[in-house]
Amino acid sequence: MKNKKAIFPGTFDPLTNGHINLIERSIKVFDKVIIIVANNFKKNQLFNLKERMHHIKKATKNYKNIKVIGINDLTTNFARKNNIKILIRGIRNIFDFENEFIMEKTNKYLYPEMESIFMISDINWSYMSSSMIKEIIFYGGNLDYFLPECVIKDIKKKIKRKIVRNLN
């Protein structure tokens, strides 16, 4: 499967060590992995698009075959315009599979030439979700195991700014 480009889309809000694990595994399979950072109108976002792109670039700075792009478009439109025919998705559990199965059928309708490659999450990350991470943040829990250091630093800055704002 080498000599191929693939896209790995997501909101990455926040970027987790589970995402990093999938990125590391993807670059072993594909020559180039384009990480697409998107907005999700259904989710309350902790970080804006630019911040999320910065986190990914910083956390993956030592990987040569990665490109990080932010989009406000359908992933299938981006893939078609750039002649990319492989989409990577992580599957943590049976619920993810159900959602990804439906999304794959929609993507196939929108861009029939694109194939979805599902990567099963390592057991260490199979339970992790952005909702769980946001709850840990809200209650001040330890994030060291779950998030890259650059993301933790920015979360602490955001919390500090919010506390200062609330004091004024």
Swiss-Prot record:
Which Gene3D superfamilies does the record associate with it? Answer: HUPs (3.40.50.620)
Q: Where is this site: Transition state stabilizer?
A: 19
* CC terms in the record's Gene Ontology section: cytoplasm
Q: What are the subcellular locations of this protein?
A: Cytoplasm
Enumerate the GO terms in the molecular function aspect. ATP binding; pantetheine-phosphate adenylyltransferase activity
Q: Which reaction does it catalyse?
A: (R)-4'-phosphopantetheine + ATP + H(+) = 3'-dephospho-CoA + diphosphate
Pathway(s) it belongs to: Cofactor biosynthesis; coenzyme A biosynthesis; CoA from (R)-pantothenate: step 4/5
> Pfam families per the record?
CTP_transf_like
Alphabetical keyword list:
ATP-binding, Coenzyme A biosynthesis, Cytoplasm, Magnesium, Nucleotide-binding, Nucleotidyltransferase, Transferase
GO terms, biological process = coenzyme A biosynthetic process
Q: What is its EC number?
A: 2.7.7.3
Binding sites annotated in the UniProt record for ATP? 11-12, 19, 90-92, 100, 125-131
Alphabetized PANTHER family for the sequence: PHOSPHOPANTETHEINE ADENYLYLTRANSFERASE
Q: Which family does it belong to?
A: Belongs to the bacterial CoaD family.
| Protein name, as recorded | Phosphopantetheine adenylyltransferase
